[in-house]
Amino acid sequence: MSARICITGASGYLGRALCRKLDRSRVLALVRAGSAARVEPGVASLELDVFDAGQLTRALAPGDTVVHLIGTPHPNPSKAAEFRRVDLASLQACASAAGRARVAHFVYVSVAQPAPVMQAYVEARQAGEAAIAEAGLAATILRPWYVLGPGHRWPYLLLPLYAIAELWPGTRDTARRLGMVTLEQMSRALARAIGDPPPAGTRRVLDVPGIRAA
């Protein structure tokens, strides 16, 4: 039997998009109480406290792939406290559990960095990456800046500005690092990362150009 793919945040818009690209018979959605009904059809779910490392450890098994997608919806600078209370705390619990369970691969959606804005968000995601490293996990870290999708379309208006910025040597690297990706690109990159894990004990990072090329 193929190893499981255990996904936190599977009921969110990115989690659902990812599940549609996977063999659903292999997926276990780890969701908060009351969220199982929002998981994609055909995906098994387990309701638990996603902030409780003990519960998460008992849900995982050696050889599993864990994909951590929990995050504050529509992040903005006013949500700094939520970034630590939700994004970081859930990641720390999940990484700790994954280490104890000896999972094979940990996949985390971080954020493009460095960045001139959203410092609290970037710091929370950097701390999440550090927790993964501390747990000694083989990991794939994806670093998008903004994912265009349902309810997240207004930044399409900025695409012409990004195109201009990528033409100039002085702004090219920043524009590419902080470029936007589509929901299709993001879910495809996640699915490919799951299917092609890095060697044991190593960490692989996909920035925006890498996500687009996946």
Task: Show where each model-derived region lies.
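N-terminal Rossmann NAD(P)H-binding glycine-rich loop of SDR-like oxidoreductase domains
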Residues: A3-R24
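Oxidoreductase cofactor-interface core, primarily capturing Rossmann-like NAD(P)-dependent enzymes
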Residues: A10-Y13, A101, P116-A214
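Structural motif
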Residues: R4, D64-T65, H105
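Conserved Rossmann-fold NAD(P)-dependent oxidoreductase catalytic core, especially the SDR/UDP-sugar
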Residues: Y13, L28, A33, P77-A81, ...
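NAD(P)H-binding glycine-rich loop region in Rossmannoid oxidoreductase-like domains
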Residues: S35-A93, A97-R100
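Active-site beta-alpha turn of Rossmann-fold NAD(P)-dependent dehydrogenases/reductases
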Residues: I70, V107-S110, W145
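Conserved Rossmann-like nucleotide-binding pocket used by diverse enzymes
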Residues: C6, L46, V107
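Short, glycine/charged-enriched secondary-structure capping and boundary segments
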Residues: R20-L22, P41-A44, L60-A61, A81-R84, ...
